[in-house]
Amino acid sequence: IYVMDEANVETCGADAELSNNELWLFAQMERVAGMVKRDKNHPSIIFWSLGNESGVGANNAARASWVKDYDPTRLVHFEAYMHNGGSRQYGYGIDFMKTNRPAVNPPEPPAVDVVSTMYPSVEGIIKLATQEGETRPVLMCEYAHAKGNALGNHQEYWNAVKKYPRLIGGYIWDWVDQSVIRKDSVTGKEYFSSLNGTNGLVFADRKIKPAINECK
């Protein structure tokens, strides 16, 4: 199995406020460096991720630089660099698939080795894969949200992946339902309790769902 090891750095909802604040640099660097030092000898890890949904800022560039210096053998990934590097906003309000500007920002820092995006349309990943002047691989770091009766158009994504060489696939959100075992107060029967967490390819007890057959 190929693994992208991702640091425990996320500021979802705060945009890039922490990534542009030098007071948070040490804490963010500590998490990234700790991950790389801990896992560097695992052969299944083929690239590092600086974190998830934490905006663009100087702290990210510093962390990417450290990782590349410490381990030049692996790629560095960070999805937030898809967004405007000159803006403190994370960029979810901009539907770049419906604009005339390049899918990847021209001023994007050369800190990352992978073009990455979340929940794109099929047309969106084709646009990324065919952008003139761009040669890096394209990854869907989150896609095909497997909630309920999902993955209905999964084949369309993989038709594109197989057609365009720069598309390298993606990570489905997510693998297993997020649940805890509870007992019914009346019958005493155990059941899996989940509040809006039934978004796995398999149930909490690892029994398969139809969605995983679609993946196969």
Question: Would you name each region that the model predicts?
Answer:
Residues 1-216:
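Extended substrate-binding grooves/exosites of carbohydrate-active enzymes
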